């Protein structure tokens, strides 16, 4: 079974423990004028509450047909409008500039390398209206955590194994009886470089979804950036 098929079938189990991000992105959407776009929309875990809270459609983009099928089914059940599109965030093109583009659940970490991430950031910046926001969250970079996880097998939230590659700051996640997916960590300075090269401005860097400041003990980057104008 491929990662796409295996992970799509178990995504809701995998993400069950991640709920605190939903109110954060919902609040950003409520503050937004203009179209709302979610990158790596997955099964609609965040997009559906955003659409429910705002009463507006959310454009969701994902590379996985299996995940989009889950999102479509869940949106129909919830009675909300998601406009779902199969596509790569590196090639983002919108019919109308967005007021908010967001990428929850560390989705940007699946984009490997500086060049590809730069392309994402530049496409997002070009797709925002003046004053529009780009928000995302990601693990705070920590070699010691990666080293501790290397070679481990975990049963929760679903059975999987982890491998850490020091050379390129990569974590490989292998689901039992399914494929493997990878995350590439980025440092704070690397994120700041991407923000700068795309012509965005930092509005806030939080250490959690309660909007507490990022500090030495923070384990999550929660970024909110803005296109000038």
Over which residues does each language-model region extend?
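A short glycine-rich, Lys/Arg-flanked "PGG" loop and its adjoining helix->strand segment in the class I
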Residues: 118-130
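Conserved class I S-adenosyl-L-methionine
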Residues: 1-42
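Class I SAM-dependent methyltransferase SAM/SAH-binding core
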Residues: 47-91
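A short acidic, Gly/Pro-enriched loop at the edge of an enzyme's catalytic core
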Residues: 93-100
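A conserved beta-strand element that flanks and buttresses the S-adenosyl-L-methionine
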Residues: 102-104
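SAM-dependent methyltransferase
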Residues: 113, 135-193
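C-terminal lobe and adjacent flexible extensions of AdoMet/dcAdoMet transferase-like proteins
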Residues: 188-229
């Amino acid at each position: 079974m491929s990662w796409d098929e295996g992970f799509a079938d178990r995504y809701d189990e995998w993400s069950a423990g991640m709920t605190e991000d939903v109110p954060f992105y919902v609040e950003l959407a409520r503050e937004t004028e203009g179209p709302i776009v979610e990158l790596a929309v997955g099964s609609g875990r965040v997009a559906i509450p955003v659409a429910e809270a705002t009463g507006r459609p959310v454009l969701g983009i994902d590379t996985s047909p299996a995940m989009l099928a889950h999102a479509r089914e869940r949106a129909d059940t919830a009675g909300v409008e998601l406009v779902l599109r199969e596509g790569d965030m590196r090639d983002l093109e919108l019919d109308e500039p967005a007021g908010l583009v967001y990428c929850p659940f560390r989705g940007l970490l699946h984009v490997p390398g500086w060049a590809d991430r730069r392309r994402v950031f530049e496409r997002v910046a070009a797709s925002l209206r003046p004053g529009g926001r780009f928000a995302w969250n990601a693990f705070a970079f920590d070699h010691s955590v990666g080293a501790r996880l290397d070679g481990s097998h975990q049963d929760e939230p679903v059975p999987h194994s982890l491998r850490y590659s020091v050379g390129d700051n990569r974590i490989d996640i292998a689901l039992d009886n399914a494929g493997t997916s990878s995350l590439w960590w980025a440092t704070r300075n690397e994120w700041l470089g991407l923000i700068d090269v795309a012509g965005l401005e930092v509005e806030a860097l939080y250490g959690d979804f309660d909007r507490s400041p990022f500090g030495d003990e923070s384990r999550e980057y929660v970024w909110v950036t803005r296109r000038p104008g």
